């Protein structure tokens, strides 16, 4: 179930402050965050936000088509290495 429209999109306050401070600065730095639950706003476009995936910060460059999605969608938490291969020679 999605979020109610009357509430509006959610973004953590500390993340919004970092993005606004970055807008006033000439030099663009990577913004580190642990807030995977924050919605991407149009004001985030053009910034690189490093989203924590449980062991490291994954850099995510925000583009126009990402607006409205959550930051956590672009930093996968699980690594899938595939199933074990069947070694039929050892079974004989």
UniProtKB/Swiss-Prot annotation:
Similarity annotation: Belongs to the universal ribosomal protein uS19 family.
Function of the molecule: Protein S19 forms a complex with S13 that binds strongly to the 16S ribosomal RNA.
Keyword annotations: Ribonucleoprotein, Ribosomal protein, RNA-binding, rRNA-binding
NCBIfam families: rpsS_bact (TIGR01050)
Keyword flag Ribonucleoprotein: yes
InterPro entries assigned: Ribosomal_uS19, Ribosomal_uS19_bac-type, Ribosomal_uS19_CS, Ribosomal_uS19_SF
GO biological process terms, semicolon-separated: ribosomal small subunit assembly; translation
Gene Ontology CC terms: cytoplasm; small ribosomal subunit
Gene Ontology molecular functions: rRNA binding; structural constituent of ribosome
The protein's name in its UniProt record: Small ribosomal subunit protein uS19
Gene3D superfamilies, per database record: 30s Ribosomal Protein S19, Chain A
């Amino acid at each position: 179930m999605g979020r109610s429209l009357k509430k509006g999109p959610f973004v953590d306050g500390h993340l919004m402050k970092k993005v606004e401070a970055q807008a006033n600065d000439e030099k663009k730095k990577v913004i580190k965050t642990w807030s995977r639950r924050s919605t991407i706003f149009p004001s985030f476009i053009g910034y690189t936000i490093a989203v924590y995936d449980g062991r490291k910060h994954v850099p995510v460059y925000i583009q126009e088509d990402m607006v409205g999605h959550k930051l956590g969608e672009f930093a996968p938490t699980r690594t899938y290495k595939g199933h074990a291969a069947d070694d039929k020679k050892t079974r004989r």
